[in-house]
Curated annotation (Swiss-Prot):
Gene Ontology cellular-component annotations: small ribosomal subunit
Family: Belongs to the universal ribosomal protein uS7 family.
InterPro entries recorded: Ribosomal_uS7, Ribosomal_uS7_bac/org-type, Ribosomal_uS7_dom, Ribosomal_uS7_dom_sf
GO biological process terms held by the UniProt record: translation
Entry protein name: Small ribosomal subunit protein uS7
Domain of life: Bacteria
Function: One of the primary rRNA binding proteins, it binds directly to 16S rRNA where it nucleates assembly of the head domain of the 30S subunit. Is located at the subunit interface close to the decoding center, probably blocks exit of the E-site tRNA.
Source species: Legionella pneumophila subsp. pneumophila (strain Philadelphia 1 / ATCC 33152 / DSM 7513)
Keywords: Ribonucleoprotein, Ribosomal protein, RNA-binding, rRNA-binding, tRNA-binding
Gene Ontology MF, one: structural constituent of ribosome
Complex formation: Part of the 30S ribosomal subunit. Contacts proteins S9 and S11.
Entry keyword annotation includes tRNA-binding: yes
CDD domains: uS7_Bacteria
Organism classification: Bacteria, Pseudomonadati, Pseudomonadota, Gammaproteobacteria, Legionellales
């Protein structure tokens, strides 16, 4: 909470390939030491690998019945957004000191914070995976998130479990 004035949010330009602000934010989260072109290469490569895997899964489910191909760029973005939605938390716990005790108070997460947390968790989970190369790690983690499994989804489940366990302290909320 600023003392002087509210600081305006910086406008993020959409990414050059898919024209998506969400993807541009994700690239910025993935970026290390200002090397954006490398982060873009990793992200776009991971998305193409993810798209191939999803198409293979859907083709196996349909048993070869072709329904027509959807727009590649739109399909990839939909898969990415669905993976991100599966990781985004809706509640989290925050420490609140009351008297001499510190309580973990469950609080609802704002929309923009939940997106940021989801992106951060996906990147962290991808970095700890065992595959060779960040592109394959990120593709694997995005696929796991798309299928509602994996480390990032587990992190969200743990956060929700913690909030559920501390529901008794919800009346200590300060807003």
């Amino acid at each position: 909470m600023p003392r002087r004035r509210e600081v305006p949010k910086r406008e993020i330009l959409p990414d050059p390939k898919h024209h998506s602000e969400l993807l541009a934010k994700f690239i910025n989260v993935l970026m290390v030491s200002g090397k954006k072109s490398i982060a873009e290469k990793i992200t776009y490569g991971a998305l193409s690998v993810m798209e191939e895997r999803v198409k293979k899964i859907k083709k196996n489910e349909e048993d070869g019945s072709e329904t027509g191909s959807s727009g590649s760029a739109g399909a990839v973005l939909r898969y990415f957004e669905e993976a991100l939605d599966n990781v985004r938390p809706s509640v989290e716990v925050r420490s609140r000191r009351v008297g001499g005790a510190t309580y973990q108070v469950p609080v609802e997460v704002r929309h923009d914070r939940s997106i940021a947390l989801g992106m951060r968790w996906i990147v962290q989970a991808a970095r700890t995976r065992g595959e060779k190369g960040m592109m394959l790690r990120l593709a694997g983690e995005l696929m796991d998130a798309y299928e509602n499994k994996g480390s990032a989804v587990k992190k969200r489940e743990d956060t929700h479990k913690m909030a559920k366990a501390n529901q008794a302290f919800a009346h200590f909320r300060w807003n």
